[in-house]
């Protein structure tokens, strides 16, 4: 399976600068924390005298709030911030296995063991309970199965929300929990049971969807060098 493609774009400044600021007056915040409302033309002149740019940081304020900064350095910092965020992103795969409300114990144990393994490897998983034909009248059995899955997978994961019906399918999502996984691995390492690999899933049983997970995301306003 191909890895999800991460596109790299140049930082886009969404704030107006210099001549783009066309309101009659602005509130300028200085590096020492003081602020002053002044005509925009005067603020632009002050920026030029400092060899800096007048940058609007709060366009919806009345009047808009601006600061003095170096536009080139600001764009560089924004680019660096975007690259740092991309480094913290990691490609993961949503793994889905399908069940039926009358799934037998052997099939349940087999598929749940695979879901557990996917979670231990850091993947998000989705258990889909499919109601064929008139079996949709047995919704309670599907919900029962969802609770059994939740209990079994709770040692390595947290359920993401409540089970959700969409048509004749019941979806249950689980997110890996690193602390639980670490504890589980430590306990398992202390046992003397030999490692037995799971039998492979049949291709029609497993559905995979690429996802991009970010460890940190923020929409910070332009930073100041000062």
UniProtKB/Swiss-Prot annotation:
Q: Which InterPro entries match?
A: T_IF-3_C_sf, T_IF-3_N_sf, Translation_initiation_fac_3, Translation_initiation_fac_3_C, Translation_initiation_fac_3_N
A cellular component term, taken from the record's GO annotations: cytosol
Q: Which Gene Ontology BP annotations are present?
A: ribosome disassembly
Please provide the record's keywords in A-Z order. Answer: Cytoplasm, Initiation factor, Protein biosynthesis
- Per its UniProt entry, which superkingdom is the organism in? Bacteria
Kindly list the places in or outside the cell where this protein is found, as annotated in its UniProt entry.
Cytoplasm
> Segment Disordered: which positions?
195-226
What GO terms are given for molecular function?
A: ribosome binding; translation initiation factor activity
Q: What is its main location?
A: cytoplasm
Compositional bias ranges of the Acidic residues kind: 205-226
Its family? Belongs to the IF-3 family.
The protein's assembly and partners: Monomer.
Task: Relate the protein's function as given in its record.
Answer: IF-3 binds to the 30S ribosomal subunit and shifts the equilibrium between 70S ribosomes and their 50S and 30S subunits in favor of the free subunits, thus enhancing the availability of 30S subunits on which protein synthesis initiation begins.
What this protein is called in its record is Translation initiation factor IF-3
């Amino acid at each position: 399976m191909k890895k999800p493609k991460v596109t790299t774009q140049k930082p886009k400044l969404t704030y107006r600068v210099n001549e783009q600021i066309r309101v009659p007056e602005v509130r300028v915040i200085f590096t020492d924390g003081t602020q002053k409302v002044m005509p925009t033309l005067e603020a632009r002149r002050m920026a030029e005298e400092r060899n800096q740019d007048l940058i609007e940081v709060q366009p919806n304020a009345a009047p808009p709030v601006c600061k003095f900064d170096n536009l080139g350095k600001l764009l560089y910092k924004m680019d660096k911030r975007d690259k740092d965020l991309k480094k913290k992103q990691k490609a993961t795969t949503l793994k889905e296995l399908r069940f039926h409300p009358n799934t037998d114990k052997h099939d349940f144990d087999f598929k749940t063991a695979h879901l557990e393994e996917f979670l231990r490897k850091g993947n998000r998983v989705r258990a889909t309970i499919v109601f064929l034909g008139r079996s949709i009248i047995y919704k309670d059995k599907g919900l029962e199965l969802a609770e059994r899955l939740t209990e079994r997978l709770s040692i390595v994961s947290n359920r993401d929300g409540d089970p959700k019906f969409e048509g004749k399918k019941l979806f249950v999502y689980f997110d890996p929990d690193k602390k639980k996984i670490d504890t589980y691995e430590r306990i398992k390492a202390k046992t003397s049971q030999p490692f037995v690999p799971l039998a492979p899933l049949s291709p029609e049983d497993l559905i995979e969807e690429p996802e991009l997970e970010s460890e940190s995301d923020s929409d910070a306003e332009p930073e100041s060098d000062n």
